[in-house]
Amino acid sequence: MTNVSTAFLVFSVLLIGGEMGNSVVAIGLTGGIAAGKSTVSKIFQEAGVIIVDADVIARKVVDPGKPAYRRIISAFGEDILIERDKTIDRAKLGALIFNDIKKRKTLNACTHKYIIYEMFKRLVLLKLIYRHQMVIFDAPLLFETHFMELFCYPIIVVSCPKAIAIDRMKKRNQLGEHQAEQRICAQMSLELKKQKAHFVIENSGSIDELTEQVNHIVSALRKIP
């Protein structure tokens, strides 16, 4: 990714805002770990909102041969590769960086600019070519990636009580309570995310209650000129 291509992309995103007045450039969707963001994202999709998923893009930018892949191998060595196909073993890499802030920052430095570039490239296509009014950036690290936050309005945060999040992680990830607690503590405070949000979705009830909250937000977003 060259500086020229990055500059062109930023110019295109700014052009979107100029062409469409005060309309939304990208709606931000983030939340706490195990808060149910993926479920909320699916409900938004069912309501006709286009989703650009950072996790999906993050997996693609580290395919063998890609620049981010080469940078990760250079930083962490070939021990993190799956022998069969030379793809990155996400579980092994995750375990390596989990309790090491310096290594997490190193990984982010290897991947974030490629993820952001691909997300904004899709935004330009969806807004300028296909003329979609509402496009959501579904990004777990939206606030931590400050550049992305600048181009998101409004921002939606999915929240749930800590006890529910821990229970979900124990079932979904086969983690012990202490491990689940560690993963929560390793992330930005959910309370801080909620303070920075324009909408908060509380995911502690039924799927019907969750859907009702999403539909209410979709109705509000459609009223934005």
Task: Name the predicted role of every residue range.
Residues 56-133:
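ATP-dependent small-molecule kinase phosphotransfer cores
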Residues 18-47, 54-56:
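Walker A (P-loop) phosphate-binding motif
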Residues 120-129, 137-168:
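ATP-dependent NMP and nucleoside kinases share a basic, alpha-helical "lid"
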Residues 40-41, 52-63, 78, 171, ...:
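N-terminal polybasic phosphate/anion-binding patch
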Residues 50, 56, 154, 198-199:
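Well-ordered beta-strand positions
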Residues 47, 69-73, 162-170, 177, ...:
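An amphipathic alpha-helix signature
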Residues 5-24:
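Extreme N-terminal, non-catalytic leader segments
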